[in-house]
From Swiss-Prot:
Main location: cytoplasm
Pfam families cross-referenced by the UniProt entry: S-AdoMet_synt_C, S-AdoMet_synt_M, S-AdoMet_synt_N
Purpose: Catalyzes the formation of S-adenosylmethionine (AdoMet) from methionine and ATP. The overall synthetic reaction is composed of two sequential steps, AdoMet formation and the subsequent tripolyphosphate hydrolysis which occurs prior to release of AdoMet from the enzyme.
Gene: metK
Catalytic activity: L-methionine + ATP + H2O = S-adenosyl-L-methionine + phosphate + diphosphate
Cofactors, names only: Mg(2+); K(+)
Binding site for ATP: H16, D162, G163, K164, R228, F229, D237, R243, K244, A260, K264
Annotated spans, Flexible loop: 100-110
Keywords of this entry: ATP-binding, Cytoplasm, Magnesium, Metal-binding, Nucleotide-binding, One-carbon metabolism, Potassium, Transferase
Family named by the database record: Belongs to the AdoMet synthase family.
Binding-site positions, L-methionine: E57, Q100, D237, K268
Protein name, UniProt field: S-adenosylmethionine synthase
Biological pathway: Amino-acid biosynthesis; S-adenosyl-L-methionine biosynthesis; S-adenosyl-L-methionine from L-methionine: step 1/1
Length: 396
């Protein structure tokens, strides 16, 4: 990777159609897991003008009023008027849910040694570009969309729920030096002028969300570059669970295994192992073992022990990389049940993750972001680890 380059990441607001779908799916998960923590949940949502469809596989002994939950989620996001093309009070809700396959349950529902819910590879990433140990482009893109939603609720009622941001950061010698370009698109009511939109977004959103030291007279701003954005939300585009996986993670800076998070209970390693990968990578960076770290974990369906674990530090490690890999295996349990218990994942915490990123958050529910407990233990383990035969070992 070059040391001088531009890197761009995007974020979307909670009112983006795909994020509506994610929040509905995770809302269903939360409602079920609150009553039945051992439930198996895999729920997808499709939203379009006047309609929400919830489908998937659920095994539980509890009852949840899914149509009521769907409507309340849509209204909370801000779609409460038919003039927006989507109204949680009146939209149709269809539900198509069956039980989990017994073939899958046979390998997963083992109380002694719970197997992975599916095969696949998951990645975790961290770097020292921000206090949250997240890449700068996605961090600032999320800051804009969060601020946009806050301003919509508290200051400018003509802003509507759908919106996007994009931030391009210029790197010099591998470090963020300045913000080169900012793109903000926000849905709005029909009567507001373009001038008012430009001024409000520039002054009340961008200026409050981004650090002044990274903005200069060469920074480019693109605010509603098409000119108008009245038709938005599910009326403008259909929304589907799991279509914003890069927004959900590292903005493209770290790799992604392809599995979405929302609507999946912790037995699905697509979610739980990705959270654990982030926790491990963040702990590595917080412990001072590297400035940049990526962790890959892979699983076979029905098998508890991971098939492989890989640690990559991109030449930034302060101790030999193979020692970090060995220390990771010594310090962290990576079986699905160990991950679930360690991160305390059997709680209704997931709807909050479904907008503005699953990582780099400071709320108490995001246990995978807390690194103090294992930081010293990992550092000590890395210093004392002895690679077998002196050979370079990254996958164990």
């Amino acid at each position: 990777m070059p040391t001088d380059f531009l890197f761009t990441s995007e974020s979307v607001t909670e009112g983006h159609p795909d994020k509506i779908a994610d929040q509905i799916s995770d809302g269903v998960l939360d409602a079920i897991i609150a009553k039945d923590p051992q439930a198996r949940v895999a729920v997808e949502t499709l939203v379009k003008t006047g309609l929400a469809i919830v489908a998937g596989e659920v095994t539980t002994n509890c009852y949840v009023d899914i149509p009521k939950l769907v409507r309340s989620t849509i209204c909370r996001i801000g779609y409460t008027d038919s003039s927006m093309g989507y109204d949680g009070n009146t939209c149709g809700v269809m539900v198509a849910i069956e039980g989990q396959s017994q073939d899958i349950a046979r390998g997963v529902d083992n109380k002694k040694d719970q197997g992975a819910g599916d095969q696949g590879m998951m990645f975790g990433f961290a770097c020292d570009e921000t206090p949250e140990l997240m890449p700068a482009p996605i961090h600032y893109a999320h800051a804009i969309t969060r601020r946009l939603a806050d301003v919509r609720r508290k200051q400018h009622p003509w802003i509507r729920p759908d919106g996007k941001s994009q931030v391009t950061v210029e790197y010099r010698d591998g470090r963020p030096a300045r913000i080169d370009a900012v793109v903000v698109s926000t849905q709005h009511s029909d009567e507001v002028s373009n001038k008012k939109i430009q001024e409000a977004i520039r002054e009340d959103v961008i200026a409050k969300a981004l650090p002044k030291k990274l903005i200069d007279n060469k920074t480019k701003f693109f605010i509603n570059p098409t000119g108008r954005f009245v038709v938005g939300g599910p009326m403008g585009d259909s929304g589907l669970t799991g279509r914003k996986i890069i927004v959900d993670t590292y903005g493209g800076m770290g790799r992604h295994g392809g599995g979405a998070f929302s609507g999946k209970d912790p037995s699905k390693v697509d979610r739980s192992a990705a959270y654990m990968g982030r926790h491990i990578a963040k702990t590595v960076v917080a412990a001072g073992l590297a400035r940049r770290c990526e962790v890959q974990v892979s699983y076979a369906i029905g098998v508890a022990e991971p098939v492989s674990v890989m640690v990559e530090t991109f030449g930034t490690a302060t101790v030999p990389e193979e020692r970090i890999a060995l220390a990771v295996r010594k310090t962290f349990g990576l079986r699905p049940r160990e991950i679930t218990e360690y991160l305390n994942l059997l709680r209704p915490i997931y709807q909050k993750t479904a907008a503005y990123g699953h990582f780099g958050r400071t709320e108490k529910e995001f246990t995978w972001e807390r690194v103090e407990e294992k930081k010293d233990a990992l550092r000590d383990a890395a210093k004392s680890a002895t690679p077998s035969g002196g050979r370079r070992l990254k996958a164990v």
